[in-house]
Amino acid sequence: MKRLSPLPLLLCLLFLVACSTAPAAVSSPGAAPEAATAYPPPPELPPAAQAETPYPQPPELPPATQAATPYPEPPSASPFTVQDALGRQVQFSTPPQRIVIAGKALFMLADAAYIFPQAGQRIVAMGNAGQGTGNFIALIDPQYEQKAILAGDAGPEQIAAVQPDLVLLKSYLAESLGKPLETLGIPVVYLDLETPEQYQRDLVTLGQIFQAPERAAAINTYYRQNVERVQQAVQGAEKPKVLILQYSDKDGVVAFNVPPQSWMQTILTELAGGEPLWKQIQLGKGWTQVSLEQIAAWEADKIFIISYFRDVSEVTQQLKQDPQWQALRAVQQGNLYGFAGDLYSWDQPDVRWILGLNWLAARLHPERFPDYDVLQQVRQFYQTLYGLDEAFVNQKIIPTLRGDLP
């Protein structure tokens, strides 16, 4: 047998021992292992988080409220209590998120609620917010088509089906609609919104509901300053004798009606420096029909015609061509006017009553309002209340103006 030389074997053993005792490579503190990258990529984020900036932009607001965002909702709200128009204490653990506006002529409630930018997100159902000449809420709320539209006579069952956490109602509906809703355990807040004083109070209530008290205070200041400016301007002026007549031709029968003493039309006349002649007769709780003989007997200095469902300019032109109306002194002297409005007439207890007051005062006392500019007033109103810019107002609101505008 051939024997192997011991020298090669010895050399192999020495080589193996040297390899096994060599020091391992040690990295300095913080250095990455050789087989790894210096900063491994983070785990893949969900798509929404990949583009997130340290200070994300606020969500885009509907066009109608972009400029009305200085009063953001606080990130968390404590329980709060609201006192409504009936003096009821309504408690909320959190701000309501599914609000329903119901009842007839609800556009007056809706227009007031939408003063608050949060309304578009929080209101989930309402009745028809139009008055025969358009729907303002549909213009300014991009989500209007996604809301449930209730029938004008919707009952508690239809309203409850929307699963509201708050229903806003005019106070006169407390017994007929409010009580059944309360029985179902649905919170109800009642609002009046019938007089300037009630507007001041009820806007504060809406400010509490939408967690925007500063917004309510700012709008109340706007209203109050406008009223004070008009009152100061007409102070000491001779009061013209005024008639405000609501025109209707239901079923082809023409009728003229005067409002109660407590209604907005009467209040506006007095605030604007006029004498409302209809206060001389016995008035009911609603519109009171008067004859042409009574209208003639009043011998008004200025007559204002209201028409909710027909172009008021057409109505006044028709009356001016009527021989019986031509015999009236106000008509002969060119003092028969169609009450101004846009999508809604400005005589009503809607948010636009302040536009009606300014317009009426300028018609009754033009010498006291030489700088009155109806277009400027309209633009300021919609900017202040709804954050609508001039381009929007020029395109969507100005073309709807009606009545006898200076």
Predicted regions and their residues:
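Extracytoplasmic substrate-binding proteins
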Residues: 79, 176-254, 278, 287-289, ...
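Short helices/loops that flank or line small-molecule/ion binding pockets
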Residues: 155-163, 184, 289-299
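Short helix-initiation/N-cap motifs at beta->coil->alpha
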Residues: 87, 145-157, 194, 282-292
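Bacterial Sec-exported substrate-binding components of ABC uptake systems
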Residues: 3-6, 18-111, 214-247, 369-406
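Short, solvent-exposed loop/turn elements at domain surfaces
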Residues: 90-92, 107-113, 131-137, 250-255, ...
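Alpha-helical, coiled-coil/dimerization segments enriched in small aliphatic residues
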Residues: 256-286
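A short, structured surface patch at a secondary-structure boundary
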Residues: 101-160, 166-172, 277
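Structural recognition of the beta-strand scaffold that forms the well-ordered cores
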Residues: 100-102, 124-127, 150, 166-170, ...
